[in-house]
Amino acid sequence: MALRLSLVIVGSVLCAASSPAAAADVLLQQARVVDGTGGPSFIADVRIRGDRIAEVAPRLAPLSGEALRDARGLVLAPGFIDVHSHADRGLLADPDAATQTLQGITTMLVGQDGDSAYPLRDWFARLDAAPRAVNVASMVGHATVRAQVMGRGLFRPSRPEELAEMRRILAAEMAAGAFGLSSGLEYEAAIFSTTDEVIELAKVAGAAGGIYISHVRDEGPRVFEAFDELLRIGREAKLPVQITHIKLGTPSTWGLAAQRMPAYFEQAAREGVDLRADVYPYTYWHSTLRVLVTDRQFFNPEKVAAGLANNGGAANIRLARYTPDPKLAGKTITEIAAVWGVSEVDAYMRLVRETMGELVAGGEMESIIGTSMSEEDVRWFVAHPRIAFCSDGELHGAHPRGAGTFPRILGRYVREQGALSLEAAVHKMTGLAASYIGLTDRGRIAPGLVADLVLFDPTTVIDNATVEDPEAPPTGILAVMNSGEWVVDGGQPTGRRPGKALRKPTGVQP
């Protein structure tokens, strides 16, 4: 990953006063501290002792043996927390997780969209034995639990005895340290589940102090019905519920965020439901061809035509990966139809037919990037005080969100557009995110808390990742500390791996 020259130069100057990546006590001097609470920033010295923040004060006298770092002109923030990450796909093979650390992420919540490692006890043990550069917390995947009980026959509602076994498995996973239940109700493994099934499982997560995070059942024409379902789950299961990667993903709903969403938060408050959400700062998404036809009639021409139209049209849906013919990656469905000499509908049906084996084999034969959200709605979600930030990204995925989400918010939406203040953005990346998950010792800069920190230049921070180069590192993220150790220094990964497998403490409510 080639870093821009300006970043390397600034980073080199920044590091001159301390040994790179040293696991030593550190004094950060005269930083602009944005402490994660949402309050005004202030200039201060911050002392790190071991893996904890020891002192925060206007001026601190250096101690013998302490590494000094001049942070004048730079922002010091808590480490960024990604509340919806798919970086667990590949984390065991890539322990440095550079696409995450280089954008300031110190903690990520994985096991999303209904898909989690199983059993979590064993997965956590592997992380304990060979730590990564990031902290990892996990949800329990609804589809994962369904698959353990129903096997390949999960394309139907569950039976009472199956639901009972799912509840037992979920309880065991929560006891192993999971932070809640996730679902991907728009995907094959879960779309056949009833709302009552999800409620009964959410009750188990809630009883253990967990949360429910949902890729809702429809993000297109029926998105508000899907939000209604989520509110019902929260109301009846009595636990916090979170709309993940919230979007209004079809042209007929564009512009409705400001009109419709306040009523949902108000309704939730009246009904005693703790409603939350998270968002990534892009108008395009990354998923599968099959998600375009939400009732799964993949070979019904009328349904396919509607699915294409509801997602911005075939010209806005691009193959990111296509195993049967890799040369098609990067082409839109419109372009593929022209190559094949068929209609866009026929091209879609052929693409799905040639990758249907993925459903049985569990492989990843295809993926798409679709542009179907409006910038107006994305900006509204980004600015809303109850909506945290997520990448929904992978370590090495086709969507630039995996490498650019957090710098993009700071550069594009804070500095360039003024959609929200720096303090508000950092709060949503840190303190708010920690409170949503239930992390009590991270997400803020205060004495006694874990020293997960990000040092960045507010005048230059920006994302550089694109669809063409989805892993391009950002500009302006100069240093990242995890548990008192530098995992990024001078804009470069250090190779240190102090990350923890985070388990939910028993009885701690989010």
Predicted segments with their positions:
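Polyanionic/metal-chelating signatures
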Residues: W123-L127, R132, A143-E161, E165-M166, ...
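N-terminal signal peptide c-region/cleavage motif recognized by signal peptidases
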Residues: C15-S19, V136
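Acidic, glycine-enriched loop/beta-strand segments at the rims
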Residues: V33-D45, G363-M373, V378, L420-V426, ...
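C-terminal cap of metal-dependent C-N hydrolases
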Residues: F299-P301, N310, T371, R379-R386, ...
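Histidine-centered catalytic micro-motifs
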Residues: F80-G90, Y212-D218
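Histidine-rich, glycine-flanked metal-binding segment
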Residues: A24, V33-G79
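Divalent-metal coordination cores built from histidine and acidic residues
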Residues: L74-L76, F80-S85, A93-S183, A202, ...
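Divalent metal-binding pocket/active-site signature
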Residues: A172-E229
